[in-house]
């Protein structure tokens, strides 16, 4: 299920933080408020994001979207992405259904 949001949901869009603690705080707030969290511009911060998603127990349910609308578009679960960096214009979608 790759919906950005479902009926009645709230979407929060944030630029990727440079600190683990900031990302953990965003995730905690979204989990508590049951909002969908989109993290933009992941790029070189992917390793930080990956470790935080693992620590929070959501690596297998979070989605990544790379090169959307392009021939090389990728939409998959974050746990499936094995490279060390992502393109600058990438998105992580975190849901708490």
Protein language model features and the residues they cover:
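Class I SAM-dependent methyltransferase SAM-binding "motif I" and its flanking Rossmann-like core
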Residues: 1-29
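A contiguous loop/helix-start segment that scaffolds small-molecule binding in enzyme catalytic cores
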Residues: 30-97
């Amino acid at each position: 299920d790759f919906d950005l949001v479902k009926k009645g949901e709230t979407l929060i869009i944030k630029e990727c933080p440079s600190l683990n603690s900031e990302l953990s705080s965003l995730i905690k707030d979204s989990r508590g408020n049951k909002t969908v969290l989109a993290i933009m511009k992941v790029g070189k911060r992917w390793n930080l994001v990956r470790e935080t998603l693992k620590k929070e127990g959501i690596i297998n349910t979070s989605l990544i979207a790379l090169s959307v609308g392009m021939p090389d578009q990728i939409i998959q679960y974050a746990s499936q992405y094995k490279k060390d960096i992502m393109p600058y214009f990438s998105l992580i979608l975190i849901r708490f259904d």
